Every structure is written in structure tokens, then in C-alpha cells.
Design a protein with these regions (language model features):
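Soluble extracytoplasmic regions of secretory-pathway and membrane proteins
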Residues: 1-443
């Protein structure tokens, strides 16, 4: 059974630490620890995430997650920007214990630049502008420098010719944490191709980059060998690329259709779904991306991941979807799905609703929610009590030739910035229901 979960890694925020000094910043505070993991479709009795993995060191409520202490230290991450030295005369801070004490650890991997000579230390001290690298008696011949720990910077040092997706995601495999980065090749000089944003007219998500959060090891997997740009780079640098078939199945199960690419393709598809030249020329049958209310403000609907059974399929799969409206009209006319599982990875599938049927669009559903007396009264009551009501993303869930809409309602106290799920709104056609959970609202 497929389940979607959210993974939030715990990186070290060096800027917020107390008693900052060279020893503490460079030798002791070297890594983050573990991750909080929660399913996207359930909460606890207080409306907070129903954590599958929590605490430091990590503890799992599900045995199969197997988040271990040794495998989930985060030396390399999105927010980890400072260099550190490991295997020094100082033990590293690991995690807090009771009574103000701290657990300590030592780096066990043979990664980083070995500080085993005066000339190495002198060169690095000059490069880093840090004389302590040269003169500190806390560094020995086995000490190592971990440099370029930000995963964006680290990948760019290896493959500067790739453009990285701004939103890498963390996955857990056999107790360890890995970062998966979607990497792109692009040009604005591809013949007979329309431009996106006056900068790009050819874009491929040909490479998946995997970074081990503990060791910093990086693997680049070539997923689209038909991409002539990536293929050329792989011939120039044959040792840094691996084929997609070499990616372990445990990692490949987490590969997903990238949201940035899907967003760009969706925007182009608003016009280029039209195949009749005359209709295209006069601008008929063009579509638009609908709007929704999020945090009480109007915004364009963004693509979102769902686990669902696509029409015509027999099994659930992980997909990225986005609905479309006819231009200047509020109803939903079609939707696009980007597929992520198995042999269907990277495929797009478009669905168009029958023209004789009017399917309410997100804007219409938001209006129905606003007009419902019971919902409006409850939201006003919460607002008047000094709490902030947060209307979450409106999700359109296709079911056969119809759809249902789901919108979570969160409540956040002014003194405590911790949103709690308090209600779920479900809409089917013109029928609206708001209950404490999805199942009750649906039935």
C-alpha cells in the first residue's frame, strides 16, 4: 500500500546557538540529527501531525521505518553552510540528555580533507582565512576538514553545467537519510520551439542527484539518455554519471515527477493542447490555471502530489496533478497528471471532462464555502476569539468522470505559531460539508 509522508530533517542552526566560539562552531557543533516523519492524511487528537518518527535520538512508532541513531546524522544539508573539522581532540555534540547533559559522538567515516601535514593546514588556513586551522592544538594528523557541506554548493562543484531544482527532498533508506535533487539541462536556442519566460525553450529533467546526508557522497543518475545535452556531458565526464538502472530500487521508489518542470509544462499546455491550427491561431479553446484561497488570500492553484488511481488504471500510484479552467471561465474543464511510479515515471496524462458536463472549478468551490452559513459562522467565531484561521490548499481529487474537493481548515493561536487542523471541508458538486475529519465530511 502506498502512503505519502512528510519528512522534515533536523539540521543544525548554527546562528541560534549560544556561547559561540571557534571550538564550539568548528569542532563540536558539526551536525544535525534525524527527521520528523508524519503521514499527510492523518493527525493526532489535537490536530497536530501524527508523527511516525520523532524525538532526538530518533524513535519510530513504525518498526519498518528503522530510523537509527548511527545512520541519521546530518553533516550535509540544505541549511548547512559552515565548514567543520572532525576526528579532532574534541568530541562532537550529538544530542541533549536529561539534567543538562549532552550525548557526544565522533565522526567514523573517512571523508573530508585529511589535515595530516603542515603545508595542507597552511594552505587551507590561507584559503579559509582561518589561522586556527594552522595553529590549533586540537587538530591531529587524523583530523579531517568537511568543506562545501551545503548540498547545492556541493553538487555545483561537481556538475556546474546542471541547473538544480530549488526544492530537494529528503528520504530515509535503511535508517539513513539521503537528499534527492532534480537536475536540469536547458537552452534557449532549440530550433522551432516556443520560449518559456523568454529564457528557456528546451528543458529536460535528465539527472537525479543523490547525496548521503552523513558522508556527503554524491551520485548522479542519468535518467534521460535521449537528452542530447546531458548525453554530451556524460561523454565528456564519463566517471561522474551512472545509468538510471544503477540506482538502488529502494531509492528509485522515491523518485518523483519534479514540480518545477510540471509547472512549466502545465503553463505551456494551456495553449498547446490545441491541435487545430485555425483554432490555435484565433486563440480559441485556450485554458487557464484556476485560483484558490490560501491563508485567506487568493492565489493560483499550485500542482500537488496525491496517491490515487488514475482513470483507466487498476492500481494506486503517486502522481502530481493540476486542474485547468477554460480561459475567463470558472469551471474545470481538464486536468493534467505527471506520473512517478515504475515504468510510468516521467509520463504525462491529460484528462478532459465531457463538454456537456459542467464541473465546478476551484474558484466556484471557494465561493460556495464562503457562502455556506454554518461554515462562515464558525470561521467568524474562531476569528473573533483572537485566533487566526488558515484555509489550506484546496485539493481537487478526480474520481472517474467527476471530482471532489477537499480543503483543510487550520487554527493558529496568536501567541503560538503552531497550526492545528480543526476541520475538513469536502465539496461534491454544489454540496458542501465541514466536519472534524475527512471521512465524516465525505459520508
Amino acid at each position: 500500500k502506498l502512503n505519502s509522508v512528510m519528512v522534515a530533517t533536523r539540521e543544525l542552526d548554527i546562528e541560534s546557538t549560544a556561547d559561540r566560539n571557534w571550538t564550539r562552531e568548528r569542532l563540536q557543533l558539526t551536525h544535525g540529527f534525524g527527521a520528523a516523519i508524519a503521514p499527510v492524511n492523518s493527525v493526532d487528537a489535537d490536530g497536530l501531525p501524527n508523527l511516525l518518527t520523532s524525538n532526538i535520538p530518533p524513535q519510530s512508532s513504525e518498526d519498518e521505518l528503522n530510523i537509527t541513531i548511527d545512520g541519521s546524522r546530518i553533516y550535509f544539508g540544505e541549511l548547512t553552510n559552515h565548514y567543520v573539522m572532525v576526528k579532532t581532540n574534541e568530541n562532537e555534540f550529538d544530542y541533549p540528555l536529561d539534567e543538562g547533559k549532552n550525548a557526544q559522538t565522533r565522526y567514523e567515516d573517512d571523508k573530508g580533507i585529511k589535515l595530516d601535514s603542515f603545508f595542507k593546514k597552511a594552505a587551507l588556513a590561507w584559503e579559509l582565512g582561518d589561522v586556527n586551522v594552522l595553529i590549533s592544538d586540537q587538530l591531529g594528523s587524523d583530523s579531517r576538514l568537511l568543506l562545501y557541506r551545503n548540498i547545492f554548493e556541493r553538487v555545483n562543484k561537481i556538475a556546474p553545467f546542471l541547473t538544480l531544482d530549488p526544492d530537494p527532498y529528503a528520504v530515509t533508506i535503511d535508517g539513513s537519510i539521503y537528499w534527492i535533487h532534480d537536475a536540469y539541462t536547458y537552452t534557449n536556442s532549440f530550433p522551432y520551439s516556443s520560449e518559456y519566460g523568454q529564457k528557456v525553450n528546451y528543458l529536460r529533467n535528465s539527472v537525479k542527484v543523490v547525496t548521503d546526508a552523513q558522508t556527503g557522497d554524491i551520485d548522479l543518475y542519468l535518467f534521460d539518455e535521449s537528452d542530447f545535452i546531458a548525453s554530451t556531458w556524460s561523454k565528456i565526464f564519463p566517471t561522474i554519471f551512472k545509468s538510471a538502472n544503477e540506482m538502488p530500487s529502494s531509492l528509485k521508489a522515491h523518485v518523483r515527477y519534479p514540480e518545477m518542470l510540471f509547472q512549466m509544462q502545465s503553463e505551456m499546455y494551456l495553449r498547446y493542447h490545441v491541435t487545430d491550427a485555425d483554432v490555435f491561431f484565433v486563440g480559441e479553446d485556450f485554458w487557464s490555471i484556476p485560483t484558490e484561497k490560501f491563508k485567506q488570500k487568493e492565489q493560483l492553484v499550485e500542482p500537488y502530489y496525491v496517491v490515487m488511481t488514475l482513470p483507466g488504471e487498476s492500481e494506486e500510484e503517486f502522481a502530481l496533478i493540476l486542474p485547468f479552467n477554460p480561459q475567463n471561465r470558472p469551471n474545470t474543464i481538464a486536468w493534467l497528471a505527471g506520473r512517478s511510479d515504475g515504468d510510468n515515471y516521467g509520463k504525462l496524462r491529460a484528462y478532459r471532462f465531457p463538454t456537456e458536463r459542467q464541473i465546478n472549478g476551484p474558484t466556484q468551490i471557494e465561493a460556495l464555502i464562503d457562502q455556506d452559513p454554518a461554515i462562515s459562522q464558525q470561521i467568524t467565531l474562531w476569528d473573533s476569539a483572537g485566533s487566526e484561521v488558515i484555509r489550506g490548499n484546496l485539493l481537487m481529487i478526480p474520481i472517474g468522470n467527476s471530482v471532489i474537493y477537499v480543503e483543510p481548515i487550520y487554527l493558529q493561536a496568536s501567541s503560538r505559531k503552531l497550526p492545528q487542523l480543526v476541520r475538513v471541508v469536502v465539496a461534491n458538486g454544489n454540496v458542501i460539508a465541514m466536519e472534524e475529519d475527512f471521512a465524516t465530511a465525505l459520508y
